[in-house]
């Protein structure tokens, strides 16, 4: 898919490097979560802008994913709960307090828990989740998987 995913690729690469060195650094763990989240935000902005004429780049992260998946797939990804948890991790890293954001506010499933701390385990999980979401989205939409994934 070439250069269209440069930001996504670069952010995911940074997230991986940060997560690998996060064992004794909360700052690196937080940065890894933010970079993994940013990689997915870059992807949804790029693909959403190409696929949806009225795509709102300024919308929040989860509503953009919800809109993109509904319009391109007619459904949400199997990884939807992981997207919600990644958003909750990002919020925790930034000091957000309150109810976690949902992909679908009407959902009857319990919302993700917001962790008290963001550490190395959460950083590794965030990077792997971003990789899984990118792979699932490409497979579900019939797009070629990027060679850097």
Sequence positions of predicted segments:
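Charged alpha-helical initiation segments
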Residues: 1-29, 138-149
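Non-catalytic, well-ordered alpha-helical scaffold segments
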Residues: 9, 30-37, 41, 80, ...
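Amphipathic, well-ordered alpha-helical segments in soluble domains
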Residues: 11-14, 35, 89, 129
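Short, flexible helix-adjacent loops and helix caps
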Residues: 20-24, 48, 52, 98, ...
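Short, contiguous, well-structured surface segments enriched in hydrophobic/aromatic residues
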Residues: 31-64
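Acidic-leaning, charged glycine-interspersed low-complexity segments
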Residues: 68-75
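Charge-enriched, short contiguous segments at helix-coil
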Residues: 75-149
């Amino acid at each position: 898919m070439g250069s269209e995913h440069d930001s996504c690729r670069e952010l995911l690469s940074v997230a991986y490097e940060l997560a690998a060195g996060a064992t004794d650094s909360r700052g690196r763990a937080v940065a890894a979560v933010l970079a993994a989240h940013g990689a997915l935000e870059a992807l949804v902005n790029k693909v959403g802008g190409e696929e949806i004429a009225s795509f709102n780049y300024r919308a929040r992260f989860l509503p953009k994913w919800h809109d993109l998946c509904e319009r391109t797939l007619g459904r949400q990804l199997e990884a939807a709960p992981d997207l919600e948890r990644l958003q909750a991790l990002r919020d925790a890293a930034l000091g957000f307090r309150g109810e976690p954001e949902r992909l679908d506010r009407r959902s009857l499933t319990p919302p993700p828990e917001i962790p008290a701390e963001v550490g190395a385990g959460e950083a590794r999980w965030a990077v792997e989740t971003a990789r899984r979401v990118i792979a699932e989205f490409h497979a579900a939409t019939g797009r070629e998987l990027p060679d850097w994934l």
